[in-house]
Amino acid sequence: MGMSKSIKVILSLALVVFLALAGTKVEASVRYITYPAIDRGDHAVHCDKAHPNTCKKKQANPYRRGCGVLEGCHRETGPKPT
């Protein structure tokens, strides 16, 4: 015996409402980084006024030159140098 069309519609709408409410609960619990947290994090880990040398910032990703022709991994269309 099948369900009537009106019961299927009501159950479908109830499911949509439930999923919409469940989605807003998850979205509301997401935490964001605030400006004070960003300001506090802009120093060295062991930064101390008594030891100012520990407060120097270091470059995150120092520049490294890519692979050259002599290493054999450079895209060169001509013959390899000997």
UniProtKB/Swiss-Prot annotation:
<dbReference type="GO" id="GO:0007204">
    <property type="term" value="P:positive regulation of cytosolic calcium ion concentration"/>
</dbReference>
<comment type="function">
    <text>Cell signaling peptide that may regulate plant stress, growth, and development. Mediates a rapid alkalinization of extracellular space by mediating a transient increase in the cytoplasmic Ca(2+) concentration leading to a calcium-dependent signaling events through a cell surface receptor and a concomitant activation of some intracellular mitogen-activated protein kinases.</text>
</comment>
<dbReference type="GO" id="GO:0005179">
    <property type="term" value="F:hormone activity"/>
</dbReference>
<keyword id="KW-0964">Secreted</keyword>
<dbReference type="GO" id="GO:0010082">
    <property type="term" value="P:regulation of root meristem growth"/>
</dbReference>
<keyword id="KW-0372">Hormone</keyword>
<dbReference type="Pfam" id="PF05498">
    <property type="entry name" value="RALF"/>
</dbReference>
<protein>
    <recommendedName>
        <fullName>Protein RALF-like 8</fullName>
    </recommendedName>
</protein>
<feature type="disulfide bond">
    <location>
        <begin position="47"/>
        <end position="55"/>
    </location>
</feature>
<dbReference type="GO" id="GO:0019722">
    <property type="term" value="P:calcium-mediated signaling"/>
</dbReference>
<comment type="similarity">
    <text>Belongs to the plant rapid alkalinization factor (RALF) family.</text>
</comment>
<feature type="signal peptide">
    <location>
        <begin position="1"/>
        <end position="28"/>
    </location>
</feature>
<dbReference type="InterPro" id="IPR008801">
    <property type="entry name" value="RALF"/>
</dbReference>
<dbReference type="GO" id="GO:0007267">
    <property type="term" value="P:cell-cell signaling"/>
</dbReference>
<dbReference type="GO" id="GO:0048046">
    <property type="term" value="C:apoplast"/>
</dbReference>
<keyword id="KW-0732">Signal</keyword>
<keyword id="KW-1015">Disulfide bond</keyword>
<feature type="disulfide bond">
    <location>
        <begin position="67"/>
        <end position="73"/>
    </location>
</feature>
